Amino acid sequence: MTNQYSILFKQEQAHDDAIWSVAWETNKKENIETVVTGSLDDLVKVWKWRDERLELQWSLEGHQLGVVSVDISHTLPIAASSSLDAHIRLWDLENGKQMKSIDAGPVDAWTLAFSPDSQYLATGTHMGKVNIFGVESGKKEYSLDTRGKFILSIAYSPDGKYLASGAIDGIINIFDIATGKLLHTLEGHAMPIRSLTFSPDSQLLVTASDDGYIKIYDVQHANLAGTLSGHASWVLNVAFCPDDTHFVSSSSDKSVKVWDVGTRTCIHTFFDHQDQVWGVKYNGNGSKIVSVGDDQEIHVYDCPI
């Protein structure tokens, strides 16, 4: 048990180019901590976190261009990646083999996310649609249309009820998954929404934008519950802590910040990266944060819990 924030581990030269995406999944049953990274070097790498360090398990080849997004299933040993090559690939984390390659269409595979039950994969498109693919079928099952601009970011609510998307023009849309209806359109930012994340109880939505602000919304009523400033440049990624009371953000200002949801304040800032920090995630119990960036490094931080 630590009672302070500190950097625990640095993996230098983790990739041969900028690292744009990271995911961390904790398998509580088998006590396995898996980190997946995606880089502009076209590779997806699978790491195991054990004994306070990252060990490279698989280096997954297949994408022809840079990897822009990765996610790990919450229920199956599967990772997904999307790339500038317009393909989504599904990977078996037990043997490091590619399971499926899905042709999503040009610029139609940006951020991707597994549904909470891992039956579907959602990805934003440049035409303002969210395409939903079946994990089993590898085919497009349906689309949700924002009638808006290029969707840079998407997130499922943990309770499986909502899907939120963030567009290049700063518009946020929240869909009801059961009906496919657009519930709310939020005009919260004037610049691209790089990332959004739901709280573990699915009540709040946190958004990150190039305008340098982080916003917190009450999902049910679509009310703005807070505007947070502190980053000196674009906010590139946000991720909620499993404890429901903190979230983490990363920015072009090279920093990683931890925020208290209740007080809407920044409680710690890490300045360990040498360049833009594209991705941040918590582990399963909120005791660790992982970050990745243009400096080709993976950092793991200790958090008090």
Swiss-Prot record:
GO terms for biological process, alphabetical: negative regulation of myeloid cell differentiation; nuclear-transcribed mRNA catabolic process, 3'-5' exonucleolytic nonsense-mediated decay; rescue of stalled ribosome; transcription elongation by RNA polymerase II; Wnt signaling pathway
Entry keywords, A to Z: Acetylation, Cytoplasm, Nucleus, Repeat, Transcription, Transcription regulation, WD repeat, Wnt signaling pathway
Major site of localization recorded for this protein: nucleus
Annotated GO CC locations: Cdc73/Paf1 complex; cytoplasm; cytosol; euchromatin; nucleus; Ski complex
Locations listed in the record: Nucleus; Cytoplasm
WD repeat residue numbers: 14-57, 62-101, 104-143, 146-187, 188-227, 230-269, 272-305
Bilayer-spanning residue ranges: none
Function of the molecule: Component of the PAF1 complex (PAF1C) which has multiple functions during transcription by RNA polymerase II and is implicated in regulation of development and maintenance of embryonic stem cell pluripotency. PAF1C associates with RNA polymerase II through interaction with POLR2A CTD non-phosphorylated and 'Ser-2'- and 'Ser-5'-phosphorylated forms and is involved in transcriptional elongation, acting both independently and synergistically with TCEA1 and in cooperation with the DSIF complex and HTATSF1. PAF1C is required for transcription of Hox and Wnt target genes.
Description of how the protein assembles with itself and partners: Component of the PAF1 complex, which consists of CDC73, PAF1, LEO1, CTR9, RTF1 and SKIC8. The PAF1 complex interacts with PHF5A. Within the PAF1 complex interacts directly with PHF5A. Component of the SKI complex which consists of SKIC2, SKIC3 and SKIC8.
Protein name: Superkiller complex protein 8
Encoding gene, per UniProt annotation: Skic8
